[in-house]
Amino acid sequence: MSATQAKFSFGNVVLVSKLVDGKFPDYGRVIPQNQPKKLKLDRIALLQALQRAAILTSDKFRGVRWVLGDGSLKISCNNTEQEEAQEELDVPYKGEALDIGFNVGYLVDVLNNLDVAEVECGLGDANSSALFTLPERSDFKYVVMPMRI
């Protein structure tokens, strides 16, 4: 064993691995800070709306558009066959409107794997990442990069 290796023992099994050279990236720099637009969203309602919209996204381009306005979040998508899906959720939001796109798969993945009633979403502008957090768990953060739609 050397300083460039890691050793793991599980009963009669021993695993030795070479450590990666270099410095671990500063992941804290990609977590958005001070996002002015805050939403509290019903996880199940949002998940179901996204799943319905995802049916009409193309396999290659999985984009959904969120249009946030006073009291509503409109979710829409379309595909190459000119089919379109639109959903609207009531949200407790008052403020500046926002039009932003996301890969629906990333949103569905996080919402599918949570066991909570409500999620919080922090948004900046159309080019800024979204930050999903949980009201009762300060250790949970999920960052979703926007995409152009």
Q: What do these predicted ranges mean?
A:
Residues 1-20, 35-149:
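DNA polymerase processivity clamps
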